[in-house]
Amino acid sequence: MDLAKFLCWIVLLLGISLVESRYMVYNTSHTIVPGKLNVHVVPHSHDDVGWLKTVDQYYVGSNNSIQVACVQNVLDSIVPALLADKNRKFIYVEQAFFQRWWNEQSEEIKRIVKELIHSGQLELINGGMCMHDEAAPHYIDMIDQTTLGHRFIIREFNVTPRIGWQIDPFGHSAVQAYLLGAEVGFDSVFFGRIDYQDREKRYKEKTLEVIWRGSKSLGSSSQIFAGAFPTNYEPPPGGFYYEITDDSPVVQDDPDLFDYNVQERVNAFVAAALDQANITRINHIMFTMGTDFRYQYAHTWYRQMDKLIHYVNLDGRVNAFYSTPSIYTDAKHAANEAWPLKTEDYFPYADRINAYWTGYFTSRPALKRYVRVMSAYYLAARQLEFFKGRSQKGPNTDSLADALAIAQHHDAVSGTSKQHVANDYAKRLAIGYVEAESVVATSLAHLTKVDPTLNPTFQQCLLLNISYCPSSEVNLSDGKSLIVLAYNPLGWKRVDIVRLPVVGGDVSVHDSEGHEVESQLVPFTDEYVALRKYHVEAYLGQSPTQVPKYWLVFSVTVPPLGFTTYTISTAKKTDGYSSKSYVSNILKGEQSIINIGHGHLKLSFSTDQGTAINYVNGRTSMTEPVKQTFSYYSAYNGSNDKEPLIPQNSGAYVFRPNGTFPINPEGQVPLTVIHGPLVDEVHQQINPWISQITRVYKGKEHVEVEFIVGNIPIDDGIGKEVVTQISSSLKSNKTFYTDSSGRDYIKRIRDYRSDWKLDVNQPIAGNYYPINHGIYLQDSKKEFSVMVDRAFGGSSIVDGQVELMLHRRLLLDDSRGVAENLNETVCVQDKCTGLTIQGKYYYRIDPYGEGAKWRRTFGQEIYSPLLLAFAQQDDGKPMSFGAASFSGIDPSYSLPDNVALLTLQELDDGNVLLRLAHLYEVEEDKELSGVASVELKKLFPGKKIGKLTEMSLSANQERSTMEKKRLVWKVEGEGSYGEEKKAKRGREIDPRKLEMELYPMEIRTVLIHLELPSSHSRINRFDA
């Protein structure tokens, strides 16, 4: 070969080599390297289950004029991206989306996805239907929505989620740490939002990662490793966003092209890693590579991350690799480090000065109430579905379960979505209710054993909150009777009051044995008539055909997990009529003091002040001056703010008051006082848009306050946040107690945080906390407790005083993404007015140390009200009940006073899911904080418990298996296994004795297989 040909050949080879060099095989196979800084690259997408768009719009990618987001694309594109490189990983959270997608896939895709999950490339973490909020949901709802997701995952993939991933909720509940963390089998929980002052201190002390011990009762037995991200849940600083619409610099590694920047991007990555390492213990850090609705075209992300991992590892200063939070947690655990201890919770949350996210504790109070009502209904409906037997083809409670699960999302019940999305959440609940209502009606017909030829139909009244109940508003003058069935979902016998609108006054009430029951007629007032008419037209599109004259009030006694029936009919001459109430309108100066109350409790009102002034309980010798008032905070307009650059308004998330304005009665408004044998009431019209009724019931030792707030006026261009204050003389010393998601109570001190020295810049908003269950004050002699009917925000801004925020109507957005002011309206045809809220709270004063029993017991009654159903009975055609009363448990038995039934549910496979909860904390009550014992046999009378398996809280694995897998963490200042004195837990259930022990704050979950007599079909579970 001559020289010329040889040189040509060499040039050709070099040319081929140069062309081929443009195809790179990136090395993504690195794993943990001891001694180096290990950067765990965690690809994820945060997919809100509704926020700016509805859940379905987000899934299919519609309504993109609001936000370009399509979760279907995310999941579609992740699968081939993972298949392209076995080292790539991805985590997914929201089961509401994943299950929609899964149900649409072919068997081949399902097989591939299962392989990806089992290989660890795709990890399902958190595992609930949504990433639930932690301020507004009740703990039972949090458990239910998590269970729904976890049981799907174990059924389809035979895996159990290990990691909590609460990266976006706006503050974090202690219940999340121990109940929805450790008790569901999680080894760690990660989140993005903690107070900016707290975060700054944790930067300096390297305490972003802690051992979180959320329950003082369960202690180290339910602690969890918890990590707060350095900033949020997004990629690290330096420009690492790779959605096709993002503008971060890509890794341009082709030297033949302009803008080659490999070293520049490596340097940015390493700099971000070293910065994060400086605030993190142990040589492992996590980069959260993703944010809201990312990976819609997954290859754009993985192409860049492949390059980064490849070139960063060639650089050698740090070690980068694809990872998951599970791998990260195991690495932290393997270091055998002792970690700082965190107790209590992460409320309230502020992301900067003057920006406390405490407004959403109250935002959309009607939706919050609707969620709570549906939660209680679902609990009762599942019980009745079990008693009858779950239908395999007909209506069931699944639709309501799904709707409730989605409603727990941190932009749903929180009240922080756009209005059309809030409407969608409510619509889903309404659809779920209709199907569950059918389940309840057929179950009750089955259990009452009414002659089916009579075509028995039990109606229900969902709109009693607006005083509308067609079933009770029937004309009984023609000889008809109304059957009222009251079902008690609690595990105790219950004596309660029923209030129903009726059209006539000559009625009497009889129990199932024909004995007359004492009753009272309370006149229907103007505020009820107006509220009823407007909202019936708004919701049903038609006006009520008649106006009730009275509320019929009577007392019912109902067995545990059972019902009793009552008959309302036209009073016969031999009957005693329902007692009409004595009504008086008292003007200022006519009578200085008015007293109401039956039995031990007396409440005094001042006509001069127009408010309650004195509370007296003769049984406990408690006498206390009280005063209840209304105020509003004008919403701050941040347009004049100089710092920060973005003005801070009060909005759906943020509460920023700009002055407090008392709301006083306009002119001389009379107190309308109603006296009767069962209840005394004081009606007050505070102003044209606020009214309230204060009630004291016979035999009860608490005060009930029903309020109506709205239409809040905004003609002055100022948003308003309406609060009520209940004042006492208690010397509470800046201290008060609020519940954690309806479970434990946490001590709060005004203007103080236990974890850092608080810089007080918002003395009102910065002292607000979420209230799901109640709030109380105490001094050395007394306890003052207030219980609520939904999630509210509240505080004790002044010693001796409880403050609740009841309603918000705002005209500005707070710049947190929703881009819509919180101005809810209700429309009749083309006329819209501000939303009116009706609700209740309750208060009571007890000797010091004795208030817990009322809070815990009555709290259960508030959460689980009686379920009422109605049937008409024609004269001459009596409805013959085979069972006019019923109890689903042994008639001689009830649950202990300190135990609540959380779940009684028949599952698809015929097994029964049972959850029981100890209601008290350690040392909360002298007697009821002790160990409780439940005889499980007596919960299933006449049935044999064939097999019983104790499960994790979310019922996706045996508890014994979960405990064996649990990681044990060291805590600074403690021994290797935490506290020397561990919290007590109930003993293993003996399969012969079948007794369950529960210690304070313990919840135990069991799966039960019932062996039914062969002569009984599955759906005739409670035939006589």
UniProtKB/Swiss-Prot annotation:
InterPro entries: Gal_mutarotase_sf_dom, GH38_C, Glyco_hydro/deAcase_b/a-brl, Glyco_hydro_38_C, Glyco_hydro_38_cen, Glyco_hydro_38_cen_sf, Glyco_hydro_38_N, Glyco_hydro_38_N_sf
Range of residues in the leader sequence: 1-21
Cofactor(s) it depends on: Zn(2+)
UniProt entry keywords in alphabetical sequence: Disulfide bond, Glycoprotein, Glycosidase, Hydrolase, Metal-binding, Signal, Zinc
Binding site for Zn(2+): 46, 48, 168, 410
EC number: 3.2.1.24
Cysteine disulfide partners in this protein: 461-469, 827-832
Source organism superkingdom: Eukaryota
Assembly: Homodimer.
Protein name per Swiss-Prot or TrEMBL: Probable alpha-mannosidase At5g13980
Organism (species): Arabidopsis thaliana (Mouse-ear cress)
Phylogenetic classification of the source organism: Eukaryota, Viridiplantae, Streptophyta, Embryophyta, Tracheophyta
